[in-house]
Amino acid sequence: MNTFNKNYWDKKYKEHKTGWDIGDISSPLKSYIDQLTNKNLRILIPGAGNGYEVEYLFRLGFTNIFVVDIALQPLKNIQKRIPNFPKENLIHSNFFDHYEKYDLILEQTFFCALHPTLRSTYANKMVELLNKNGKLVGLLFDFELTENGPPFGGNIIKYIQIFYSNFEIKILEKCYNSIKPRKGRELFFIFEKK
């Protein structure tokens, strides 16, 4: 099955079959965002789903937040929850067709939803979308990669192989503040574009 299919994802959201949705911003991303001081950063959240990170950033006064999602329903959900959020910043498109530039890209369960054959393409696309010294920051699952996803897992060694040629790996380590159901199964990372 091609999991990167807008009908598949729209159906999941319409039927509320979103077991990955924790209903709030994840504590690791909240902690990272809380230490950001530049509210003018251009921030992209690809495959944001219901976009709790978007809502958190917006309420903190960040002004340049963008979401790209192949599924329309989660974008509608964000707009409904945050009516003042700029509608033009909710981009209904295939991530791989997106061509803007950003200072920061936040990763929260998008990478793990892509089939593993797309991982190198994902890494290359992230480099393309980031400004010089831009950062890709977020969470990756730390469990054995199988074909039984999404979610698709991986490990530190696999992730280094995917990202090291284009990124300086600042941090890639076991996440100390994961939510209980994901404890011991997540890696927090900060990758800076070379």
Residue spans of the language-model regions?
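Class I (Rossmann-like) S-adenosyl-L-methionine-dependent methyltransferase catalytic domain
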Residues: 1-100, 114-194
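Conserved acidic residues
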Residues: 103
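A conserved beta-strand element that flanks and buttresses the S-adenosyl-L-methionine
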Residues: 106
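Short catalytic micro-motifs in class I SAM-dependent methyltransferases
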Residues: 109, 113
